[in-house]
Amino acid sequence: IEVPIPFVEESLGNQNLLRILPAFLNVINSGGMLLIDEFSSGFHNELESLMVRYFMEKADRAQMLFVSHSTNLLSNSILRPDQEYSVEFQNGNGSTVRRFSSEQPRSAQNIEKMYVSGVFGGLPEYKEVSDEAE
């Protein structure tokens, strides 16, 4: 049985994909710059990797700048450290942008683990919820 699903009932990942796919394909085919905030919001890890790899293989005269909270893309096999940046917010005093290659990671190092351990900055700081706050 084929029943169309209304857009609003699609998953967040499917909605996000359907929103960005036209611009994504247009930039690949026509060239230009694609800016995407929350690129992989709702995507399966395999889909976000596939899209980045596809863009890098097919886009001749195009660039993509995207923001993602997913660490899945911090793989040596997907992006190089000179293509990865972190943004660290300075408690109301602006932000600091750091290129991962500034730490000169070796090709055998696990970039995702380095990021999660705080080497590149950009990690959010969460305070413990105390009993007094309740």
Residue ranges and their predicted role:
Residues 1-25, 39-43:
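Conserved ABC ATPase signature
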Residues 24-32:
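Short basic/glycine-enriched coil/helix segment immediately N-terminal to the Walker B
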